[in-house]
Amino acid sequence: MDWMWLLSGACIVFTLGMFSSGLSDLRVMVAKRSVENIQFLPFLTTDLNNLGWFYYGYLKGDGTLIIVNLIGASLQTLYMAAYILYSLERRYVVSQVLVSLGVLFLAHCYFTLWTPDINSRLNQLGLFCSIFTISMYLSPLADLAQIIKSKSTKCLSFPLTVATFLTSTSWVLYGWVQSDLYITVPNFPGIVTSLLRFWLFSRYPPDQPAYSLL
């Protein structure tokens, strides 16, 4: 049973390591008192994803999911608060947050009022969270296509790629051990996109010129 605790610990450490990548953006915003070219949407979508999986873990009684996503949601909320504080488009950003809160409220009403059966609630929430997670992992594909076109990986973060690969792999194993497809399936795309990034790093090293004269 010790190996299960080890796997759970790996999920927590690797996932929190991936979530903490936003600390570098936080330092930039605080130091320059500006959001620079930092995007707000990744913070918001990750926060929503964390809250969804937190509720799933709560319904399932899974301490690993609860811990990871509670801390993750707290970090994303911190990043969003700093972004709102230093953004010049504060009204637009706040409107996005309010719309998201409205969606969360409607989802809460649906799952608590119209889905009283705990198993149905768990299955529907698991399906929703899985689809949302898959879409997040696949969303950077357009950027990867642009990297192939420009033959430059300067905009990619190698440490974040490693963290994403380790996180996705640990959750695939965790879900497989627990026979939970809602955890296993949505993390496969994370492995695939990470392997694709590794290939791009080997094909187009960061110190390599983006274009050749030949």
From Swiss-Prot:
MF (Gene Ontology): sugar transmembrane transporter activity
Membrane spanning residue stretches: 3-23, 38-58, 65-85, 93-113, 125-145, 157-177, 181-201
Record's bilayer topology term: Multi-pass membrane protein
Domain MtN3/slv: 6-89, 124-207
Entry keyword annotation includes Transport: yes
Localization in the cell: Golgi apparatus membrane; Cell membrane
Signal peptide as annotated in the record: none
Record function comment: Mediates sugar transport across membranes.
Family: Belongs to the SWEET sugar transporter family.
Protein name, as recorded: Sugar transporter SWEET1
